[in-house]
Amino acid sequence: MSGELGLRKFLESNGHELIVTNSKDGEGCEADKHIVDADIVISQPFFPYYLTKERIAKAKNLKMAVTAGIGSDHVDLQAAMDNKIDVVEVTFCNSRSVAEHIVMMIVSLVRDYHNQHRIVNEGGWNIADAVQRSYDVEGMHIGTVAAGR
């Protein structure tokens, strides 16, 4: 897993070892070296460690795969079931972050940030042109449509 999520003190005071790595991609990565002895793997949905059938086969002690967020598309669920590995997520843990992200994206779209960022990176900048396509949120009626929780 990347980031300790505030778990180190709790786990180590109870006799467990917590290994944190961001080397999780490609065969032979740091995470692959530790999965052989791991009881639990904690991964994050936007920086996942993919628990493939092959990785699960090497993880003889693995009992649980935890998503520190929502989703399990980075886990081969059939392989997990075949090996009696529980796959769990921390439901609703990131609801506030998702809402903040939506507000950030709305402001980014209204201000034409993506397009202006591209123009600046290409060496251009015309303030009059930028202002013409940039708006204030004040006075707008904004609605969101959610397909999740």
Question: What positions do the PLM features span?
Answer:
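N-terminal glycine-/charge-rich "phosphate-binding" loop or analogous flexible N-terminal tail
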Residues: M1-I40
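Short beta->alpha connector loops
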Residues: M1, N22-G26, P45-Y49, G69-S72, ...
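Phosphate-binding beta-alpha-beta segment of Rossmann-like dinucleotide-binding domains, i.e.
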Residues: N83-I85, T91-V145
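Rossmann-fold NAD(P)-binding glycine/threonine-rich loop
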Residues: S72-I85
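Short acidic active-site motifs
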Residues: E27-A31, Y50-E54, V75
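Residue-level detector of alpha-helix initiation sites
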Residues: G71-H74, E89, C93, G148-R149
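Short, conserved loop/helix-junction motifs that constitute active-site signature segments
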Residues: E54-N61
